Design a protein with these regions (language model features):
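Conserved non-catalytic scaffold segment of RNase H-like nuclease domains
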Residues: 2-107
Length: 107
């Protein structure tokens, strides 16, 4: 059976201050949130089959941090027009398909 390999990269916006909240009695701290997903689907011979890119609208860190804009090329308008994360993740998973294997690019 041919492999369906998805190489993906996440871009994150960070807050100027961490965001801490109580979730079902457990203290949680967010330092950033995903604002873009980029991906390439390749076959077992490394042929590019398809590409995917989506901007996500942040819920917590809504203002694009200057350094993130500089590094990624994203704009505040990209984030403002982005899809809600749940909807965006659903679209990404549908694009990946049920037999996808994943590899992440990041540092």
């Amino acid at each position: 059976m041919p492999r369906n390999l998805v190489l993906f990269d996440l871009e994150w916006n960070i807050g100027y201050q961490p965001y801490t909240f109580n979730y079902h009695g457990v203290q949680q701290t967010f330092r950033g949130e995903i604002v873009e997903i980029g991906a390439v689907k390749i076959d077992e011979d490394a042929n590019v089959l398809d590409t995917f890119s989506i901007h996500l609208k942040p819920r917590i860190f809504r203002k694009l941090q200057h350094h993130i804009a500089k590094v990624t090329g994203l704009t505040q308008a990209d984030l403002d027009r982005g899809e809600p994360i749940v909807q965006g993740l659903r679209r990404f998973m549908q694009w990946c398909g049920p037999d996808a294997e994943f590899a992440e690019w990041g540092m």
